[in-house]
Amino acid sequence: MAKKAPRRTAQRILEVTLDLFNRFGEPNVSTTAISAELGISPGNLYYHYPAKDALINTLFDQYEEALNGLLQASDSVHNVEDAWFFLHTLFELIWEYRFLYRDLNDLLSKNRRLETHFQAVLHRKEKAVHTMLEGMQQAHALLPGTETRAALPTTATSMVVVLTYWLSYEYVRDPRHALEPGNAHHALLRGARHVLNLLEPYLEATQRAHLQALAQVYAPTAG
């Protein structure tokens, strides 16, 4: 049992660090604060994670691994209902690691490894969303023709921009409450709806009607 203690301690450090980063923002959380929250010495924290960047990088690695798994589902999206679920699932993961998006520019300016990995993440997101759109067109959920197909790359990029910066927008709207756990449900619904709204001009009539129906269902909470 004793041999497993360091592994449990390391995982507990990550869990508490993620919670503190999400609540207060990474720049506002010191390793001393993390140690105090855990009730361990700074030396014990240093033994497992010798620098704050080590914590950030490990949390990002967890996020990246989970994201890669979710993005693989993009080729299973064939209609608005599938797209809504796919995007909401992505937003749920972004919410779980929301400190990365809340403090994105600051983190990238200080961490070269994070900078290069996040660029790769954006590329994979765009590729996955483009795959989703192609699947929807092949399933006749999107309007046929060269005009729609020509618009897919730009639309995919626009969707990824909203997906990436939606929580920053929520935070600016209400800095004191937007990123609190109790607001997750509404924030994620709003995000999914606004990303899908970018598709509306290209949706086949019944799919457009279904998107509008979804928007009405979630109108009281989706904003």
Show which residues each predicted segment covers.
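N-terminal positioning helix adjacent to the helix-turn-helix/winged-helix DNA-binding module
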Residues: 9-16, 155
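Helix-turn-helix
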Residues: 12, 20-58
